[in-house]
Amino acid sequence: LIAPLKELAEYDEIRKVTRQGKGTVALSGCVDSQKLHMIYGLSDGLKYKVIVTYSDLKAKEIYEEYRFYDRNVMLYPAKDLIFFQADIHGNQLVQERIKTLRRVVEGKPVTIVTTYAALMTPQVLWEEKDIIRTERGGSLDESKLASRLVAMGYEKAYQVESPGQFSIRGGIVDIFDLTEENPYRIELWGEEVESIRSFDILSQRSIEKLVSITVYPVSYTHLRA
């Protein structure tokens, strides 16, 4: 994709300057499609990249177009200060922000498309102690687990129906991580984790057996249990 760019002396010069990290480089005269191609070429090989624009609408447009170049691109929208806490369940904005933060915490390559407003919002990344990790054969205390999940922003329910909820009944723990398409089901024998699997929310049927899982907070800041 960047072979044609490499033939341009100007591109080679700009790439060298940007890799030196000395000051700001300003480019002009490119149409939108050329801008994204240039961004991809100049940042090729970098593990972390951030594309900042002026509005969520423009960020969404860039995100959709940039997916052609980079499968690791993710959208990080700004908070809606009025409606942000109104309904955590199924909230696309919250899910997109949490998924992006998760990828950063996991240290995976990512290109983040965001806005000035989103960057200006104070944000604290989670620490290892803010995350729940468990595996088959490990141990879990139901009472302590429930307290931690509530502290992480999860809502306790009789039966899990939407992302951000969890339930504990009869040695079975269901958790619907906000960043996953399907919830997890953990079966306990006493405090021993006997099995872990993902399951379908409607049919309740198992989808995949899992060796281990990582559960991330639903909220950005939370009380630590």
Language model features with spans:
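ASCE RecA-like P-loop NTPase motor cores
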Residues: 1-224
